[in-house]
Amino acid sequence: MLTIRSAKPQDAEALLAIYAPYVTDTAITFEYDVPTAEEFRSRIENTLKKYPYLVAEKDDRILGYAYAGVFKGRAAYDHCVETSIYVEQSCQGMGIGKILYNALEEVLKQQGILNVNACISWIDTPNEYLTHQSPDFHAHMGYEKVAHFHLCGYKFNITQPS
């Protein structure tokens, strides 16, 4: 049975194992280098000071995680967040992301968050680094496109339109 729980700093290595292929093989994240376990641990700790950071676990194995963070660094944005979600690539399409996001959104609602944003990479013609899987997932979850930043990211010697 899949369980959702709050992430702990000691989950860093398991979460990093899920995240690393997104860094090295995709333009889903614009991060170029895989962070160290210590850096990832620090990210978890910093996020948990204010926002939820959830993991999906089955049989003591973490299969995915989702968290919220600062949308913009100004006080007027305090009731808005940016979300991120990563599911182990071999487990995609199994409903884990939907369960994680539903749980994350419930916690955010309890915290008084009014606006949940997902900043998603987009490319008109999918390639080996970027597909429409994330935008399609977010649309399925009820997210609506509200902006488009043109030629905003550069990774793998390709300008990603974002």
Language-model-detected regions and their locations in the chain:
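Acetyl-CoA-dependent GNAT
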Residues: Y32-S90, V107
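A short beta-loop-alpha structural element at the N-terminal edge
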Residues: T3-L15
